[in-house]
Design a protein with these regions (language model features):
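Structured core elements
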Residues: 3-5, 45-47, 72-76, 126-127, ...
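Substrate-binding cleft of carbohydrate-active enzyme catalytic domains
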Residues: 1-125
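An acidic- and aromatic-residue-enriched active-site/binding cleft used to recognize and process polar
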Residues: 5-11, 78-80, 130-133, 145-147, ...
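Flexible, acidic glycine-rich loops studded with aromatic residues
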Residues: 124-130, 135-140, 146-295
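Short, compositionally stereotyped local motifs that mark structural "simplifiers"
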Residues: 249, 253-400, 417, 426
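Flexible loop/turn segments at secondary-structure boundaries
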Residues: 9-15, 74, 80-85, 132-137, ...
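Solvent-exposed serine/threonine-rich low-complexity stretches and specific carbohydrate-binding patches
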Residues: 443-453
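Aromatic, loop-rich ligand-recognition surfaces of beta-strand-rich domains
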Residues: 383-445, 458-507
Length: 507
C-alpha cells in the first residue's frame, strides 16, 4: 500500500517556489532549502492566515485522494517554524478570529482544518509527532520520530494510534557502518545490528500503548542519493532487519541466527538486481593514547568473521596475524585490517596510517570525553561524525596538551574541518599559550580567521599552523573562540555553530 504524504505547513519550499503568494512571508525570490532544517529559508512556511492556502491544499487533496486508493493520507506537520506566523498580520488576525492564544495552537488549527477535509473524503489522517505539541486533530495517527519516538506516547495517552519510526534507530539516511567506507550522508550511525536489536515495545509502557501501536517504519530521506542504486544501498539489508523487528515475537531476537538467515536471503535479493550494502563486514576502530603509546582496538558487528591485520602497510590476507585482542604501537605505523570468513575477505580493508609526532600518545585535558582523538595519530575524514573528531557546539573551547616534560617545540598545528551544509565551521580565533607549571601561561601565537574564511561554502579539512615558535615547554594550551551563529546569507543562516578538531601535531 502506498500512502501519500502531503507536507504542511513546513517542508513546502517546492510548492512555494511555484506559488510564492501562499508563503509566510511572501517572497519575491526563489525559495531553496538544504536537507533537514536549512537556515532561514526553512522558516518560510504556508501562511495560516491566508484562505488561499487552504483552497490550494484542498485542491491538492482532491487529486491525491483520487489518485491513491490508500485509506490514509499523511499531512506532515513536522519542523514547522512559527517565527513568521508570530509577526504576520494575517496569521495574527486568524488567531484573534479563532480565539487562539498560543502560536502552537495556530498549527493545531491549520492541521485540524486540513484533517477535517481529508476525513470528509473518507480518508484517515497521519502526521508527525510535533502534532502532540498542541491539540491533536481527531483520529490522527501519529508517527513517533524525534529521538527514540517517545512523543508518540503523548498521542497514545489521548487514545490515538501511533507508529514508531525513531530517528536514532530507524532513519536509514544515517550511516550503516564505519563511516570511513560509506557514501557521504549526515548524522551518526544506524547499523544493521542497531536496527535489528530495536524493541519498539518498551518495558515501562502502559498496557494500552501496545494495543494502539500500529507498527514500525524505517524512514529513508534521499537528499544524498542520486540514483535508485544509492537508495537500495541504504535500504538493504537494513530493511530485512526492520521486517524482523515488525514480525518477530517479543523476546525472540537472536543476532547470530538472524545473520544466518540473512546470508541465505541476500543472494536472492541481489539476483533481483538490488544493490545491497556489505557494511556489516567492515571494521570499526578505536585508537587511544596509553602511556606514550597508542592502543589499537578493532571490532566488527558480525561475530562469525575473523579479523586479520598487518602493521607494515601490506594488504592483510588469511595468513596475516589474527586479531584476538588490542595491541599497542610506539612509532609511526600503517595498520591494515580486514574481515575474513572461510578464507575469503568479506569486508573492505581498513587502513590506519598512524603518524607519530611529539604530541602522539600524550594526554589531553579537556571537557570532551573523546578529546583523546587529538593525540591518537589518526587524521579524521571529511565526515565530522566518523569518531575521529571532537566537537564543541555553541561554545568556546579550551584544552591543554601535556608533553610530559619540557620539550623543544618549533611548530604546532590543529586540524579543523568545515562542513558549511551542517553549520560546522572553523573558529574565529585560535590562541596558543605555553607553560611549564600548568599555572602560568604565556601566549606565543594567535590565528584570526576572517568571516570569508570561516563561512566559505565548502567541505574541507585544514590545519591551523603555528610555526617558527622556538620554545621549550611542557604544556600547550589551546583557547578557541566559537564564531557564534551562521551569518545572513549563509546556507545555515541563524544556526549555532559546531567546531570540530581531529589532531594536534607538534614538531
Amino acid at each position: 500500500e502506498v500512502i501519500p504524504e502531503i507536507e504542511m505547513p513546513a517542508h513546502t519550499n517546492s510548492s512555494l517556489a511555484a506559488y510564492p503568494q501562499l508563503a509566510c512571508p511572501v517572497e519575491d525570490r526563489f525559495i531553496g532549502v538544504l536537507p533537514g532544517i536549512g537556515g532561514k529559508n526553512s522558516e518560510i512556511v504556508y501562511c495560516a492566515g491566508n484562505d488561499s492556502v487552504f483552497t490550494f491544499l484542498e485542491d491538492v487533496i482532491d487529486e491525491v485522494a483520487e489518485l491513491f486508493p490508500s485509506k490514509y493520507i499523511h499531512l506532515g506537520g513536522d519542523e514547522a517554524s512559527k517565527v513568521n506566523w508570530a509577526r504576520c498580520p494575517k496569521c495574527q488576525a486568524r488567531m484573534k478570529a479563532e480565539h487562539i492564544e498560543h502560536i502552537e495552537e495556530l498549527q493545531s488549527y491549520f492541521m485540524t482544518r486540513m484533517s477535517n477535509y481529508v476525513r470528509s473524503k473518507g480518508k484517515e489522517v497521519m502526521g508527525w509527532d510535533e502534532l502532540t505539541n498542541s491539540t491533536l486533530p481527531e483520529g490522527a495517527i501519529i508517527y513517533g520520530w524525534q529521538g527514540m519516538g517517545k512523543a508518540a506516547l503523548k498521542a497514545a495517552e489521548q487514545g490515538h494510534r501511533f507508529i514508531m519510526t525513531p530517528a536514532r534507530i530507524l532513519y536509514l539516511i544515517r550511516y550503516q557502518g564505519p563511516q570511513w567506507f560509506e557514501p557521504v550522508t549526515y548524522f551518526g550511525n544506524n547499523t544493521l545490528k542497531d536496527v535489528y536489536l530495536y524493541e519498539p515495545v518498551q518495558k515501562d509502557w502502559k498496557p494500552a500503548y501496545e494495543s494502539l501501536l500500529m507498527g514500525v517504519q524505517a524512514s529513508m530521506w534521499t537528499e544524498f542519493c542520486s540514483s535508485a542504486a544509492d537508495v537500495e544501498y541504504q535500504l538493504f539489508p537494513r530493511l530485512l532487519a526492520l521486517a524482523d523487528v515488525a514480525w518477530a515475537q517479543k523476546g525472540t531476537k537472536d543476532w547470530p541466527a538472524f545473520l544466518s538467515r540473512l546470508d541465505r536471503v541476500l543472494p536472492h535479493v541481489e539476483t533481483l538486481g538490488m544493490t545491497c550494502a556489505r557494511s556489516m563486514y567492515n571494521i570499526d576502530h578505536k585508537v587511544t593514547p596509553e602511556k606514550k603509546r597508542l592502543r589499537v582496538m578493532l571490532s566488527c558487528i558480525r561475530p562469525d568473521v575473523e579479523i586479520h591485520y598487518t602493521c607494515d602497510g601490506t594488504e592483510p590476507t588469511i595468513a596475516s596475524p589474527r586479531y584476538d585482542d588490542s595491541f599497542t604501537v610506539d612509532a609511526s605505523t600503517c595498520v591494515k585490517a580486514a574481515t575474513f570468513a572461510q578464507g575469503v575477505q568479506m569486508g573492505k580493508t581498513l587502513t590506519l596510517d598512524l603518524q607519530w609526532n611529539l604530541a602522539t600518545g600524550k594526554p589531553v585535558i579537556a571537557s570532551n570525553e573523546n578529546s583523546y582523538v587529538l593525540t591518537n595519530g589518526v587524521r579524521g575524514s571529511l565526515r565530522h561524525t566518523d569518531s575521529e573528531w571532537t566537537g564543541w557546539y555553541d561554545q568556546d573551547a579550551s584544552f591543554v596538551l601535556d608533553l610530559g616534560k619540557k620539550t623543544q617545540v618549533n611548530e604546532v598545528s590543529l586540524g579543523c574541518i568545515t562542513n558549511s551544509g551542517m553549520a560546522v565551521h572553523k573558529p574565529a580565533v585560535i590562541r596558543l599559550s605555553v607553560s611549564n607549571d600548568k599555572k602560568n601561561y604565556r601566549q606565543i601565537g594567535e590565528i584570526v580567521y576572517t568571516p570569508e574564511e570561516i563561512f566559505a561554502n565548502r567541505t574541507a579539512v585544514e590545519d591551523a599552523l603555528f610555526d617558527n615558535l622556538d620554545v621549550k615547554t611542557r604544556y600547550l594550551r589551546f583557547e578557541v573562540k566559537n564564531p557564534g551563529v551562521c551569518p545572513k546569507g549563509d546556507v545555515r543562516e541563524g544556526q549555532k555553530i559546531w567546531m570540530y578538531f581531529d589532531e594536534v601535531i607538534v614538531k
